[in-house]
Design a protein with these regions (language model features):
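C-terminal beta-signal and adjacent terminal beta-strands/loops
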Residues: 4, 617-625, 644-691
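Acidic, small-polar-rich N-terminal luminal/periplasmic segments of exported/outer-membrane proteins
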Residues: 36-174, 506
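Outer-membrane beta-barrel translocator/receptor signature
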Residues: 117, 130, 140-142, 153-230, ...
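Repeated loop/turn-to-beta-strand initiation elements of outer-membrane beta-barrel proteins
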Residues: 202-205, 239-242, 301-304, 356-359, ...
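Acidic/polar loop-and-plug regions of large Gram-negative outer-membrane beta-barrel proteins
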Residues: 212, 216, 229-235, 239-297, ...
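Structural signature of Gram-negative outer-membrane beta-barrels, strongest in the C-terminal barrel
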Residues: 235-237, 356-368, 407-526, 558, ...
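Membrane-embedded beta-barrel scaffold of Gram-negative outer-membrane proteins
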Residues: 291-321, 468, 476, 498-558, ...
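Gram-negative outer-membrane beta-barrel transporters
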Residues: 346, 350-353, 425-430, 523, ...
């Protein structure tokens, strides 16, 4: 593809910057009717209407029957202080390596993100962790969408496994404020403040602030994080709305690689043991997001929505990471990290109706600038930099670091996409989509001067159908393909080909008053997925191909206004097909997993009373390594429970326990040396005040 065409496509994708000209064409007297056909299953109670500039659209909500939206009230009731806590409420999700505690990482339907960068996730429809991003703070979250399968499109982006989209809180024109104060185990202190109000008849503002400090349950591993999220909504008239959302995050903690396995036992050493060096200090993660979206009614049943998001971040710090076990001496590798990311994204989409067709056409693009500089020194018999695995004593003199990796990556990507949902009959709905991507990727090795370039323009397609057997029962089928660019280089300094995928799903769903159930069979194949190199785990390597197929069940039950039950189960058979790896099993992906969560509310007419909740999560045996060790992370069951008492509409008290029975388990693993243990029993007590 010519450079000129590429530049034109990128410019087209950045067209939302011109959306400020829309008032001239927006007619306030002729705006679209609200969509009453939303069918995505809502877990919890949706308190605010979906914003089409931030979340999945009506086509995805109608056609992706295996998708779920987890609302804020259920996130609070379930004690979801981390993204992984929330994803336990949906089938087919498992925890992955958290990169020293510095990121959110998970697998969906057996497919994982890179061990270093983590699984991709979106915030308000924009990819939010391209390159890197710190763990999400729950204070800013309105809802979390898990969009599964080829029909789970988000502004043209599709993954046959699934995508996570976190929808942010936005301003309201009705004044409201809340403050939550939490104290818990390990001297954890947390404060959340949230206030929103109109500034005029057309302008509203919101400010969310969160601060958390904890001594942590791992020896010498503390945590400090701060989040400030201002937002503004401007509605000059009924047919036009602009929303700005900002987010500034600071995340400070020692880099923590967890614990090693002893004699093949992932739970052999005390889970509180820290094998780094307190003298390394903290690793500092800084992240800023600034986002502007707009929605305009352009007449009839047509609307135009678009936005631009700019994100910058940095991660810097030192660590002493487990490398090799010789007797009781745990050799360590000394490292430093200096990562910087600058990511600019934009999109625009025109959507509307033509008879029985719901059509959308969009353009999007991004510019990524990502630099990674590592220094390290490997241990040796002469200088093992060791620590006793059974009785760690700190204070070893760190070896002098040497240059290791110094890469600078740049990407330019432009996308055009279109989709059509055709209501063929009152029972049959069909949809199809096409996506054209044009990209350039350049990775420069600053140590050697070598430059790797990739230019391509792939096209992907997807198809889906839904048939209503009865008013309450529907069958669905979907097929689609996708691709994702990979970052980084292998042990030879060579960049990676993109990750590509094809997959289908078949399923049935039922929706009766207070009951939602869905059963789905999926079969997906991907190529080019990155995992740790079996020859040298300090580097990444692509898996030739990976296939995952399985069955998922998701169900929710609401009994009057008091009781709600959410349950899920997944059987996932994920296998790699690459002779370079000693095993065909996939890291941290269980055959069987599931959870159940129950919530009961008992409030009087003045909103006084109490709420009870309890849940169980099961995770089956998982591969803990892909080398020849055969390490297996044992299955576990984890319980949680909470009680909340509302003294009035404005004041409530809450006590909760996570890992109620203090199960000792391995949460995830990167290798036999880097296993992250699950947290012990954790108690939290909260006071919430609202106005």
């Amino acid at each position: 593809m010519s450079t000129l065409l590429f530049d034109r496509l990128t410019a087209a994708a950045l067209f939302p910057l011109l959306i400020g000209a829309l008032p001239a064409i927006a007619d306030p007297s002729d705006h679209p009717e609200s969509d009453t056909e939303q069918e995505i299953v809502v877990l919890g109670t949706r308190e605010t209407a979906g914003d089409p500039t931030l979340s999945s659209g009506p086509v995805t909500e109608r056609m992706s029957q295996s998708s779920r939206s987890i609302e804020r009230d259920l996130l609070i009731a379930a004690g979801a202080y981390r993204l992984g806590d929330a994803l336990e409420l949906v089938s087919g999700v498992s925890s992955q390596n958290n990169r020293g505690g510095m990121l959110d990482n998970f697998a969906i339907r057996g497919f994982l993100g890179t061990p270093d960068g983590g699984a991709e996730y979106y915030v308000d429809g924009f990819l939010a962790n391209r390159g890197m991003a710190p763990p999400r703070d729950p204070a800013t979250v309105e809802r979390i969408e898990l969009l599964k399968g080829p029909a789970g499109a988000l502004f043209g982006d599709v993954d046959p496994g699934g995508r996570v989209n976190i929808v942010s809180k936005t301003p309201k024109f009705d004044p409201a404020a809340s403050a939550t104060f939490t104290y818990g185990s390990f001297d954890t202190r947390r404060v959340e403040l949230d206030a929103t109000a109109p500034l005029s008849s057309t302008l509203a503002a919101r400010l969310v602030v969160a601060a958390e400090d904890s001594d942590g349950w791992r020896d010498t591993v503390s945590l400090k994080r701060r989040t400030v999220a201002p937002s503004l909504t401007w509605e000059p008239h009924a047919g036009l709305r602009f929303t700005y959302i900002g987010e500034i995050t600071r995340f400070d903690a020692p880099f923590d690689r967890g614990v090693p396995a002893l004699n093949g036992d992932a739970n052999a050493v005390p889970r509180s043991n820290f094998y780094g060096e307190p003298g390394d200090g903290i690793t500092r993660f800084r992240n800023q997001r600034h986002q502007l979206t707009a929605l305009a009614d352009v007449g009839g049943d047509w609307s135009l929505n678009g936005g631009v998001a700019w994100r910058t971040g940095s991660l810097r710090g030192f660590s002493s990471d487990q490398s090799r076990l010789v007797g009781n001496a745990l050799w360590r590798q000394r490292r430093s990290r200096d990562f910087v990311v600058d990511d600019l994204s934009a999109r625009i989409e025109l959507a509307g109706r033509i008879g029985a067709h719901r059509v959308s056409i969009g353009a999007k693009g991004y510019l990524l600038d990502y630099a990674e500089r590592w220094m390290r020194v490997n241990p040796s018999a002469a200088n093992s930099y060791a620590i006793d695995v059974l009785n760690p004593v700190y204070g070893a003199v760190p070896p002098v670091l040497r240059p290791f990796t110094d890469n600078h990556e740049k990407r330019w990507s432009g996308t055009l996409y279109a989709q059509d949902m055709w209501e063929a009959t009152d029972r049959l709905t069909l949809t199809g989509g096409v996506r054209y991507d044009a990209y350039r990727q350049q990775i420069r090795n600053n140590r050697t001067g070598a430059i790797g370039r990739t230019i391509d323009d792939p096209v992907q397609f997807r198809l889906a159908g839904r048939y209503k057997v009865a008013d309450a029962i529907a069958l669905h089928a979907a097929w689609g393909e996708s691709f994702v660019l990979n970052s980084g280089t292998d042990r030879f300094g060579t960049g990676f080909a993109p990750e590509t995928a094809k997959g289908y799903e078949l399923g049935a769903s039922g929706a009766w008053r207070g009951i939602d159930v869905a059963v789905t069979w999926f079969d997906i194949r991907k190529r080019g997925i990155l995992t740790n190199d079996p020859t040298d785990s300090n580097f990444l390597a692509p898996i030739g191909s990976l296939r995952a197929h399985g069955i998922e069940f998701d169900g929710s039950l609401k009994l009057d206004s008091r009781w709600q039950l959410v349950a899920n189960y997944a059987w996932t058979h994920a296998r790699a097909d690459d002779d370079a790896f000693a095993t065909d099993r996939v890291l941290n992906v269980p055959h069987h997993s599931g959870s159940i969560f129950a919530l009961g509310r008992f409030l009087d007419a003045d909103a006084r009373g109490f709420s009870l909740s309890a849940g169980l999560a099961y995770m089956g045996d998982r591969a803990g390594a892909i080398d020849g060790s055969g390490l297996v992370l044992p299955a576990y069951v984890k319980a949680k429970a909470a009680v909340e008492y509302a003294l009035s509409r404005q004041v409530s008290l809450r006590a909760e326990a996570d890992n109620l029975f203090d199960a000792h388990y391995a949460q995830s693993s990167y290798s036999p040396m880097w296993i992250f243990p699950g947290a012990p029993r954790t108690l939290r007590f909260s006071l919430r005040i609202t106005s």
